[in-house]
């Protein structure tokens, strides 16, 4: 009794025999017998359920039932008061429902429920189901027999023996329930684990509503095993006469009986249906309950009278027989249940009213009745052996027949022999049927009948040799207490009880064998799964090890390449530094040499210019002397002195102007020479830098090509390893799928074979049962005929011949009727066989179709999986190749970018230097011009002042001369009047000529100065145009080189536009050695420093007439001042195009 430990949390410590007094037997549930009992401490009436605890029994279902009852606290669920253990029996005290179950009511009264009664019962059951479903409980055995009524008309749900507990989000995968009320998704759990939930109870509710309306469930005329095959493939059942019912009732049943559980409504949703909302209260059921109680009371009284008569006739021997029969028939009305995964449920449907009239089934069993004929003797009844239970009932019937026919003639004796032979044949066929049933149930392993519970509740005097105190309170103790116990059992009920007892023993053995087989299969499957998992793990480990080794090798190669690259970078940077220092030294030496040469040339030119000036001065002095001589002759001494002074000033001014022009020319030549030297030096430096960059880029390209080759080789090796691993995994998966497919096909074939065998065995058992019934009817008819003959023989002894003739005629008639009945019976059997063969064929075809569909689906899944894996492998391989090409392309692009940026830097430095030179020139040239203008203004002002002074002196001299002449006139009025007038005229003429000469010389001086300034400006403009043209040519060459490199890259770039797996990645190109550290101003080497990875601001340089900017007319672009460079060089994939091209 080790399993009783599972019940300890729910079991009380009191003695149930002292707590309860049993009044009568009410019914039998899925686990035990239910009695009406009185709780002695309080005097309350309760329902006491007594269950026999066998050692072979599993207690999980008992624990589940008690746990659910203990949890539930609702008005529509049977209340639970407690549980106790006494010996090997469990006592469960629950609420007593005196109204009985709904099936008992409509079976006993032979009247189905009307629609208003059904609506009330439906509403109350829905309330109970709603509570259960909210607490995650599935009833799984909802039917009319499990819906109880109290005496006041309250509806209660009972019998949780096969219920299941759910988690919040889980579903069940067990095959439990009663076949006629079972949902399709629950039936499908026979072979495949199909999950189901609380919606299964809604289907059962719909079937119970049809049961209440029609007094039997749908498909009740079919055997329960056949129903299991037909429910999943048939349309949902409907009411037979739908015209007699309301639309709401029909619609409610349709919403319950949806084959798809997702379309089925919940209990809370169904409570809002108009069929339920418009119901009346429990007063609807009061009439039914009162009728049923009256019927039960009358039945109990009749049973008591029959017991008294039989007890007076039989005596002590019959009491002993009754006790033996109670032992054998204690489980006669147990429900046949379906068991899967160790749980039970009832199989057989309740009989219809017509069947109950003929057979007398489904009566309550508080009493066991035995009918015996008054003519049976005590010797024949006492001589019966109680070793085998099944032949016992048959032998009793034969003894009664022989006792009735004792005194007849020889013909009657022969007939009696025939009847005894038929009875023995029926007994043997019954034993055969039990054997066949055992074989059929051992083949399937899914269907059993739970009838072994009544052994402990049918009145054993002692259990396993224990004392009388340990036995449970039963009908015997009730009889001793003075309560009436009626015993009414027909011969058919006894035979059924015997069959159930035999079948229960067989079922237990079969269940044990099935469980052992299932355990073995599970162990084998677990071992196979473990082996497969081990193989998979080993493969995965090998693949991971290979992948890690390859990754390590590739990482080591990359590290070596990076180290070499760093070393090469360092060497290149050192070489570049050394080259730059050498270039700087050379440039400085060249500049110093050129400056010395220029200074020497300038000195020589100055000397030559001075010599020329001296010669010109000598010539002019000679000319002036000649002129002075002429003037001296004609003019007075003072004027000659003034003129000489004036000529000296003019000479000095001319000499200053010539010196200024010569100095300007020399300065401009110096500037031009310096500019040419600087441009040549820059050009040489740029050439050297471009050559170095070209050499560095070629080295880098070679290194990248080598890296790419190494990476491609690594990828190829990695992909070969991956292919091998994938092939191995595919082969493993194929073998596993083939193995699983073979196992499934074998399992399905075995299942088909077992199902066919079960079906054939059921057919044979049904045929045998029908034959037995037919033979029993024949024997009854024959008995009646013999009784009539006996009476006629007693009454008319003299008319033997007439009686013989009548007997022959009746015999012939009886043989004819027998032959016709046999023919009809054979035809019925043939029809039944044809129908069953058709059902079997359809079922086999459907199962074969399912097998084919499953095979096709598995093959499709395998093919799709292989295709997906191939596609993934191909895409990964192509993607890796494309990534390599893209990386190569990006690296090339980065190198080109670096080249372009370096060229830009060089060009920018050149432009900056040119702009600085032009600015210096611009600064120097206007300063010289302003100095010249100032000097010219000063000289002109001085000349004007001298002119004014000369004119004043001339005027003063003229006045003095006039005064002298007047004095002379006064002295000698008449001396030389003509000579004075002539002298005045000559003097005026000379003054005019001198002023004109001075003005002409000044005008010529201005013209010369303007011409020289214009020529200087024109030369500066030409020089600037040359510089700009050179710059534009350089830019044009750079742009053409860039375009060529772009075209080369485009021709070499991979075509990855259509690949959707490419992601946009940032280019990580290697940077060339930077030239920022050694770039300085013009005096040192090259100009301002720049960074290779950023956009630069370019400045424009131009000189106008008075310091303005000049826009070149060439097609090549001149970059404006303070403006970002418009080239972005973005490598956005998969387009592989520059965003902004020139």
From Swiss-Prot:
Residues 300-322 have a biased composition (Acidic residues). GO terms for biological process: intracellular signal transduction. Its cofactor is Mg(2+). It catalyses: L-seryl-[protein] + ATP = O-phospho-L-seryl-[protein] + ADP + H(+); L-threonyl-[protein] + ATP = O-phospho-L-threonyl-[protein] + ADP + H(+). Disulfide bonds: none annotated. It comes from the Eukaryota. One of its GO terms (molecular function) is metal ion binding. The keyword Transmembrane helix does not apply. SUPFAM superfamilies: Protein kinase-like (PK-like). Pfam families: Pkinase. Residues 371-390, 421-452, 541-554, 1068-1091 have a biased composition (Low complexity). Residues 716-1050 form a coiled coil. It is an enzyme of class 2 (transferase). Keywords: ATP-binding, Coiled coil, Kinase, Magnesium, Metal-binding, Nucleotide-binding, Serine/threonine-protein kinase, Transferase. Its EC number is 2.7.11.1. Residues 300-492, 515-636, 744-768, 939-974, 1040-1142 are annotated as: Disordered. Residues 355-365, 391-413 have a biased composition (Polar residues). InterPro entries: Kinase-like_dom_sf, Prot_kinase_dom, Ser/Thr_kinase_AS, STE20/SPS1-PAK. Belongs to the protein kinase superfamily. STE Ser/Thr protein kinase family. STE20 subfamily. This is Serine/threonine-protein kinase dst2. It comes from Dictyostelium discoideum (Social amoeba).
């Amino acid at each position: 009794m080790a399993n009783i430990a599972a019940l300890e949390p729910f079991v009380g410590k009191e003695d149930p025999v002292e707590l309860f007094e049993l009044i009568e037997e009410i019914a039998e549930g899925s686990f035990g017998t239910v009695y009406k009992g009185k709780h002695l401490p309080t005097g309350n009436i309760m329902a006491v359920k007594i269950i026999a605890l066998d050692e072979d029994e599993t207690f999980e279902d008992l624990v589940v039932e008690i746990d659910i009852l203990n949890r539930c606290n609702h008005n529509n669920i049977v209340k639970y008061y407690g549980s106790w253990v006494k010996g090997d029996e469990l006592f469960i005290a629950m609420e007593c429902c005196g109204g009985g179950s709904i099936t008992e009511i409509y079976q006993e009264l032979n009247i189905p429920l009307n629609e208003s009664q059904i609506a009330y019962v439906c509403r109350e059951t829905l309330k109970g189901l709603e509570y259960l479903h909210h607490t995650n409980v599935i009833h799984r055995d909802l039917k009319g027999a499990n819906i109880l009524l109290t005496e006041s008309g309250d509806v209660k749900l009972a019998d949780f023996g096969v219920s299941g507990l759910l988690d919040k989000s889980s579903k069940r995968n067990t095959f439990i329930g009663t076949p006629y009320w079972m949902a399709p998704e629950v039936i499908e759990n026979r072979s495949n684990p199909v999950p189901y939930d609380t919606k299964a109870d809604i289907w059962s509710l719909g079937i119970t509503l049809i049961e209440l309306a029609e007094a039997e469930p749908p498909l009740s005329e079919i055997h329960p095993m056949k129903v299991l095959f037909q429910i999943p493939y048939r349309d949902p059942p409907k009411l037979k006469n739908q015209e007699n019912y309301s639309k709401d009732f029909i619609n409610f049943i349709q919403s319950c009986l949806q084959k798809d559980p997702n379309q089925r409504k919940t209990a809370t949703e169904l409570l809002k249906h108009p069929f339920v909302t418009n119901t009346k209260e429990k007063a609807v059921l009061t009439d039914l309950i009162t009728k049923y109680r009256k019927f039960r009371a009358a039945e109990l009284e009749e049973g008591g009278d029959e017991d008294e008569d039989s007890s007076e006739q039989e005596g002590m021997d019959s009491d002993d027989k009754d006790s033996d029969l109670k032992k054998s028939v204690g489980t006669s009305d147990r429900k046949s249940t379906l068991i899967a995964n160790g749980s039970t449920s009832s199989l057989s449907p309740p009989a219809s009213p017509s069947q109950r009239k003929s057979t007398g089934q489904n009566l309550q069993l508080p009493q066991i009745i035995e009918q015996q004929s008054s003519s049976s003797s005590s010797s024949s009844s006492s001589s019966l052996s109680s070793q085998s239970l099944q032949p016992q009932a048959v032998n009793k019937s034969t003894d009664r027949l022989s006792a009735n026919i004792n005194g007849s003639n020889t013909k009657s004796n022969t007939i009696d022999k025939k009847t005894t032979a038929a009875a023995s044949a029926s007994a043997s066929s019954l034993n055969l049927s039990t054997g066949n049933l055992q074989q059929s149930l051992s083949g399937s392993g899914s269907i059993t009948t739970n009838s072994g519970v009544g052994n402990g509740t049918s009145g054993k005097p002692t259990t396993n040799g224990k004392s009388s105190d340990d036995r449970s309170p039963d009908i015997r103790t009730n009889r001793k207490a003075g309560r009436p116990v009626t015993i009414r059992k027909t011969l058919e009920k006894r035979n059924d009880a015997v069959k159930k007892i035999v079948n229960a023993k067989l079922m237990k053995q079969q269940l044990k064998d099935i469980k052992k087989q299932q355990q073995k299969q599970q162990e084998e499957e677990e071992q196979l799964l473990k082996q497969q998992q081990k193989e998979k793990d080993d493969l995965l480990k090998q693949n991971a090890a290979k992948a890690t080794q390859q990754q390590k090798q590739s990482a080591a190669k990359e590290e070596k390449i990076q180290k070499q690259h760093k070393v090469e970078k360092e060497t290149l940077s050192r070489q570049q530094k050394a080259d730059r220092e050498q270039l700087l030294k050379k440039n400085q030496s060249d500049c110093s040499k050129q400056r010395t040469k220029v200074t020497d040339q300038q000195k020589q030119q100055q000397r030559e210019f001075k010599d020329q000036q001296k010669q010109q001065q000598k010539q002019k002095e000679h000319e002036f002397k000649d002129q002075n001589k002429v003037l001296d002759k004609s003019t007075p001494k003072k004027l000659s002195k003034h003129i000489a002074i004036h000529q000296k000033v003019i000479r000095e001014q001319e000499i200053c102007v010539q010196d200024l022009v010569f100095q300007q020319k020399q300065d401009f030549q110096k500037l031009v020479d310096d500019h040419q030297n600087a441009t040549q030096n820059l050009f040489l430096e740029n050439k050297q830098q471009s050559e170095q960059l070209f050499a560095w880029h070629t080295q880098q390209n070679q290194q990248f090509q080598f890296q790419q080759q190494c990476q491609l080789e690594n990828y190829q090796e990695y992909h070969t390893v991956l292919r091998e691993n994938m092939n191995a995994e595919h082969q493993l998966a194929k073998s596993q799928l083939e193995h699983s497919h073979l196992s499934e096909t074998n399992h399905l074939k075995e299942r088909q074979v077992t199902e066919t065998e079960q079906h054939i065995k059921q057919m044979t058992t049904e045929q045998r049962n029908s034959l037995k019934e037919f033979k029993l009817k024949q024997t009854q008819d024959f008995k009646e005929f013999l009784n009539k003959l006996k009476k006629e023989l007693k009454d008319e002894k003299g008319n033997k011949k007439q009686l013989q003739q009548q007997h022959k005629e009746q015999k012939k008639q009886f043989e004819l009727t027998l032959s016709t009945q046999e023919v009809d019976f054979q035809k019925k059997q043939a029809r039944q066989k044809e129908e069953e063969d058709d059902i079997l064929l359809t079922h086999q075809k459907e199962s074969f179709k399912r097998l084919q569909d499953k095979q096709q689906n598995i093959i499709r899944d395998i093919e799709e999986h292989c295709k997906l894996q191939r596609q993934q492998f191909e895409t990964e391989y192509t993607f890796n190749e494309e990534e390599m090409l893209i990386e190569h392309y990006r690296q090339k692009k980065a190198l080109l970018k670096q080249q372009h940026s370096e060229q830009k830097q060089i060009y920018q430095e050149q432009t900056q230097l040119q702009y600085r030179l032009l600015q210096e020139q611009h600064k120097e040239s206007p300063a010289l011009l302003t100095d010249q203008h100032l000097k010219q203004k000063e000289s002109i002002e001085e000349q004007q002042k001298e002119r004014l002074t000369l004119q004043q002196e001339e005027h003063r001299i003229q006045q003095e001369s006039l005064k002298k002449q007047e004095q002379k006139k006064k002295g000698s009025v008449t001396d030389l009047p003509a000579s004075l007038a002539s002298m005045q005229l000559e003097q005026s003429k000379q003054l005019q000529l001198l002023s004109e000469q001075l003005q002409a010389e000044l005008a010529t001086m201005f013209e010369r100065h303007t011409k020289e300034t214009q020529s200087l400006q024109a030369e500066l403009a030409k020089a600037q145009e040359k510089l700009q043209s050179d710059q534009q040519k350089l830019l044009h060459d750079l742009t053409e080189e860039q375009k060529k490199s772009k075209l080369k890259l485009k021709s070499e770039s991979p075509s990855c536009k259509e690949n959707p797996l490419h992601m946009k990645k940032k280019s990580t190109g290697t940077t060339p050695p930077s030239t920022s550290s050694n770039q300085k101003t013009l005096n040192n080497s090259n100009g301002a420093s720049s960074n290779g990875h950023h956009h630069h601001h370019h400045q424009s340089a131009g000189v106008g007439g008075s310091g303005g900017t000049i826009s070149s007319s060439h097609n090549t672009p001149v970059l404006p001042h303070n403006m970002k460079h418009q080239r972005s060089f973005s490598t956005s994939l998969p387009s592989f195009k520059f965003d902004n091209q020139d």
